[in-house]
A protein has these predicted regions:
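Transmembrane helix-loop junctions in multipass membrane proteins, especially transporters and channels
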Residues: 15-23, 54-58, 94-101, 124-128, ...
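Final/C-terminal transmembrane alpha-helix of multipass membrane proteins
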Residues: 137-157
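Alpha-helical transmembrane segments
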Residues: 29-43, 98-109
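Alpha-helical transmembrane segments of multipass membrane proteins
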Residues: 6, 10, 41-45, 85-89, ...
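Intramembrane alpha-helical segments
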Residues: 1-22
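Hydrophobic residues within alpha-helical transmembrane segments
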Residues: 33, 80-83, 141, 145
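Solvent-exposed interhelical
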Residues: 39-83
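Transmembrane helix-loop-helix
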Residues: 79-130
Length: 158
């Protein structure tokens, strides 16, 4: 539910506010697809943000998705979700925008991909490295890459 509101709903309300369009236009596929992809991205990312707190969750009796998947399962789930979401965005940008937007997105996701693979390889060797520090680095890098993408999109389309 949280992902739907933080992703889909926030995307639609923000799009509506920025573009000053009739609310009925929010139902078009050009707007619905990225709203759904935003939700999917958040749903894919959320379990990895909990990967470092399995012991605490278990002690409190919390049954999070990350805890149920296990550490490596959480990494696999997140990777699969990111790949599906990235393919969705690439298709969307190619179909509704242009190849430059698609390429910009892919280029700015490379640092995120490299870090994720690097961290995953470290976790395979030592499960203790699925920790708060690495999780927050992933969050910061993700925010930096995505914000850079959207900022450049605004600049190039201004």
């Amino acid at each position: 539910i949280v992902s739907v509101f933080q992703g889909y709903f926030v995307f639609l309300v923000t799009y509506w506010a920025i573009h000053d369009i009739p609310i009925s236009r929010l139902t078009t596929s050009m707007i619905q697809i990225p709203a759904l992809l935003t939700t999917m991205m958040l749903m894919s990312a959320y379990p990895i943000t909990q990967v470092y707190q399995h012991k605490e969750d278990r002690k409190r009796g919390d049954f999070t998705l990350s805890l149920r998947l296990g550490v490596l399962g959480t990494f696999h789930f997140t990777a699969l979700g990111f790949v599906i979401t990235a393919l969705g965005y690439v298709s969307y940008f190619f179909y509704y925008h242009d190849s430059q937007t698609m390429l910009l997105y892919l280029i700015l996701m490379i640092p995120l991909l490299i870090y994720y693979i690097f961290w995953y390889q470290k976790v395979i060797k030592s499960i203790d490295l699925a920790d708060f520090e690495h999780t927050m680095k992933l969050n910061r890098l993700s925010a930096l890459c995505l914000n850079a993408f959207f900022l450049l999109l605004i600049i190039f389309n201004a």
